[in-house]
Swiss-Prot record:
Fructose-1,6-bisphosphatase II is not light-activated. InterPro entries: FBPase_C_dom, FBPase_class-1, FBPase_N, FBPtase, Fructose_bisphosphatase_AS. Binds 2 magnesium ions per subunit. Pfam families: FBPase, FBPase_C. Mg(2+) 1 binds at residues 81, 100, 102. This is Fructose-1,6-bisphosphatase class 1 1. It comes from Cereibacter sphaeroides (Rhodobacter sphaeroides).
Length: 333
């Protein structure tokens, strides 16, 4: 059975075959994760990627599976977190696909949700120009989350769709054609252990949230942190709120930690198509062009009002950050 047997009109015809291939591999990856520890150790380290990050066994397994499945498809160039350079799959192809085959793989041994993120551009004649381009030129992007439910959230530029994997039929069922980010929430996600390294506008924003009813926001907030980008995204699409992974003063974190091409760009596309916002803290993510395949960027996304507020903190002169948003009690929503 095809992985997307229902609502054939929901996927553009020129992308149907590629989506079928992505969906089929996602179903197999989900099954492999569910059997982790029975047949093999999926959490064991087996190498490092181009940026020196440790690769889990399932990182490599998933990358190989997606790459092989896309051979002979319309995908001309394939760029992966697990590959140093882009790979040519089909010289006659018309698409360029960037992918993180297994985002959040550090969570495999703890049984927390992990996922796959992907982004699709029209292919240029050569690999680098196909990928080193504006995020706004994406024609499709999405993610799969392997959790209690296996879900795919995807956009083809006309809103964000939600599919749920039916284990019985081993197919993805369209359950929502127009997912929307809730406009308001009292949740924010950030790794607070890095507070001392953050830029002042980020610290000021978090300080105001932590102050709760006694602070300028006049309400209490809850902090979340899962260390899984797809899990954080899925929660925000369901409940609203904001995710922050800012640049900081540590060596190697000056431009944040998340990769633009196959992490931030696809998530930003899905979120903005669902009515949310996505920036690097100051400027829209989709208005940026990465300088290299594995370029990093600070990342802030979520409910549009929350993202706009954080941008406004950056726009203020340093001496006004606390005064305008604190003592004067503006923007209390």
């Amino acid at each position: 059975m095809k992985p997307f047997p229902t609502h054939p009109d929901a996927i553009p015809a020129e992308l149907q075959d590629v989506m079928d291939r992505l969906g089929s591999v996602a179903i197999e990856v989900a099954n492999r994760i569910a059997r982790g520890g029975i047949d093999e150790d999926l959490a064991g380290l087996c190498g490092t990627n181009t940026d020196g990050d440790g690769q889990k066994a399932l990182d490599v397994i998933a990358d190989d599976a997606f790459r092989v499945a896309l051979e002979g498809s319309a995908v001309r160039f394939y760029a992966s977190e697990e590959q140093d350079t882009a790979v040519t799959l089909n010289e006659a192809g018309t698409l360029a696909l960037a992918i993180d085959p297994l985002d959040g793989s550090s969570n495999i041994d703890t049984n927390l949700s992990v996922g796959t993120t992907f982004a699709i551009w029209p292919a240029a004649p050569r690999p680098n120009p196909s990928f080193l381009r504006l995020g706004s030129e994406l024609i499709a992007a999405g993610y799969v989350i392997y959790g209690p439910q296996v879900c795919m959230m995807v956009s083809f530029g006309k809103g964000t769709q939600k599919y749920v994997l039916d284990p019985g039929s081993r197919s993805f069922v369209l359950v929502d054609r127009a997912v929307k980010v809730p406009p308001s929430s009292t949740e924010f996600a950030i790794n607070a252990s890095n507070y001392r390294h953050w830029p002042k506008p980020i610290r000021a924003y978090i300080d105001d949230c932590v102050a709760g009813t006694e602070g300028p926001r006049g309400r209490n907030f809850n902090m979340r942190w899962l260390a899984s980008l797809v899990a954080e995204t899925h929660r925000i699409l369901a409940r609203g709120g904001v995710f922050l992974y800012p640049r900081d003063s540590r060596k190697g974190y000056e431009q944040g930690r998340l990769r633009y091409l196959y992490e931030c760009a696809p998530i930003a596309f899905v979120i903005t198509q669902a009515g949310g916002g996505a920036t690097d803290g100051e400027n829209p993510i989709l208005g940026q062009t990465p300088s290299r395949l594995h370029a990093r960027t600070p990342f802030v996304f979520g409910s549009a009002e929350k993202v706009a507020r954080i941008t406004a903190y950056h726009d203020l002169p340093e001496q006004e950050t606390s005064a305008l948003f604190g003592n004067r009690g503006l923007f209390r929503s």
